[in-house]
Regions:
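A cross-family signal for N-terminal binding/gating loops and helix N-caps
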Residues: 3-141, 145-184
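Conserved small/polar residues in nucleotide/adenosyl-binding loops
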Residues: 186-193
Length: 194
């Protein structure tokens, strides 16, 4: 991305801008890339299959997330690098997550797949208590001791284009971040990327 395009996106009000660099990787499979680069807690590997028979075009490899959101019994915890930095008691965890997500203004760029980061994780069966008022007060023993909701803020990922063997290395930056110049330098096209 050129600096002029980046500045234009800032003027349009975007505050979570994906910067990317593409490289051709024709000797590693998406799974091999995951095992080499992201096989850590709070990382993920998503493959797609169409119709149960054909591989989808993209594979998504989320590098270890710095920020993780956990919800249990109307309590929302935000962890950064494994430490709780915020804890809230909320009336509606799903509304809270929607509000949290709305703080990120992310442009959709033609050069990237539709999914290029965001909230990734799970919503467990127990969230029905947050949706159906009649079930809100049912106390059930938590045998698994896992959050009702766990979401990773996926800022850094690889998107493997299985059709072209190209890997998009993506990081999302906030225009107010101090390391912005380093990110722009890193993602600027080099002569060999042509």
């Amino acid at each position: 991305m050129k600096k002029s395009q980046f500045n234009s996106l800032i003027k349009e009000g975007y505050n979570h801008i994906p910067l990317s660099r593409g490289v051709v990787v024709d000797t590693d499979t998406p799974l091999a890339l995951y095992l080499k680069l992201a096989n850590n807690p709070y990382s993920y590997f998503l493959e797609s299959v169409q119709g149960g028979e054909k591989w989808g075009r993209y594979s998504f490899i989320g590098l270890a997330a710095e920020t993780v959101i956990k919800v249990n019994d109307y309590e929302v915890r935000i962890e950064k690098n494994g430490k709780i930095v915020h804890k809230y008691e909320v009336e509606d965890p799903l509304a809270w997550i929607e509000e949290y997500q709305n703080q990120f203004k992310v442009p959709q760029l033609d050069s990237l797949p539709d999914f290029n980061g965001g909230l990734v994780g799970y919503f467990g069966y127990e969230i029905v208590r947050y949706i159906e008022p009649k079930l809100a007060n049912i106390n059930k023993t938590d045998e698994l001791n896992v959050p009702d909701i766990l979401l990773m803020v996926s800022n850094d990922l690889l998107v493997v284009d299985n059709l072209t063997s190209k890997v998009h290395i993506i990081t999302h930056v906030n225009p107010n971040d101090e390391s912005l110049e380093d990110c722009l330098l890193y993602t600027s096209p080099s002569p060999r990327d042509s």
